[in-house]
């Protein structure tokens, strides 16, 4: 690892000189950070992570190995992104136009995706384009997220469906008989649903 103004970059990582990396962040082996990407302070960007052009990542974000964050993705502070998570950004993916010509940037419309603060995305989950994942939401491993996920919502499956709520401490709070969880978190004692809005 090399030290550049308190940013650690592994020698095999490829970081564009046009990217902005916050202090205390680490970029691990074989990661690629493209032009105009912005990574906040105290982040961990794991092995073989791809951070596309103009992607924005907040402070204290953990991006585990083999994650792909494509153009149009914004990740707020304190988010956990598990191994092999893939963000998509094109609702109508095609390599060529109907006339057979190769698609260019002019033929393509990026869908924006937002992951709000404190959310957690389990390993191997896929996030379809144009999705917002709410604050402190939790996406189970292997899920395919096809719709917005509310604050504190726990979802899993293909397509991802509501299973309950997620406490900021990480404790899953399962719905009972189709009703959202109400009460105290058994791990940290927080009241649910939260008494103050996010």
Q: Could you describe each region identified by the protein language model?
A:
Residues 1-4, 196-198:
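Basic/polar N-terminal segments that are highly enriched at the extreme N-terminus
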Residues 2-11, 16-19, 26-132, 164, ...:
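Flexible, glycine/small-residue-enriched loop-and-beta-strand segment within the central core
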Residues 135-138, 144:
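Internal alpha/beta core interface subdomains
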Residues 147-148:
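Loop-to-transmembrane alpha-helix entry segments
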Residues 151-158, 166-178:
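Short, intrinsically disordered, charge-biased short linear motifs at domain edges
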Residues 162-165, 183:
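Cys/His-enriched microdomains
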Residues 167, 185-188:
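Short cysteine-rich clusters marking metal-coordination/redox-active sites
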Residues 175-176, 193-197:
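Short, non-ligating residues that shape and space the ligands of small metal-coordination modules
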């Amino acid at each position: 690892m090399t030290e550049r103004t308190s940013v650690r970059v592994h020698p095999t990582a490829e970081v564009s000189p046009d990217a902005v990396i916050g202090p205390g962040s680490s970029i691990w082996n074989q990661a690629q950070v493209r032009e105009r990407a912005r990574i906040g302070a105290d982040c961990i960007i794991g092995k073989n992570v791809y951070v596309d052009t103009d992607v924005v990542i907040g402070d204290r974000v953990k991006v585990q190995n083999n994650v792909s964050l494509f153009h149009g993705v914004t990740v707020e502070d304190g988010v956990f992104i598990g191994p092999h998570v893939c963000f998509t950004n094109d609702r109508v993916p095609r390599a060529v136009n109907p006339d057979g010509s190769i698609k260019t940037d002019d033929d393509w419309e990026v869908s924006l995706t937002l992951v709000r603060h404190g959310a957690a995305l389990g390993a191997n989950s896929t996030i379809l384009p144009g999705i917002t994942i709410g604050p402190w939401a939790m996406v189970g491993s292997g899920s395919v997220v096809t719709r917005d996920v509310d604050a504190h919502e726990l979802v899993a499956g293909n397509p991802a469906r509501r299973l309950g709520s997620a406490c900021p401490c990480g404790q899953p709070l399962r719905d009972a008989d189709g009703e959202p969880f109400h009460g105290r978190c058994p791990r940290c004692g927080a009241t649910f649903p939260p008494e103050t809005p996010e």
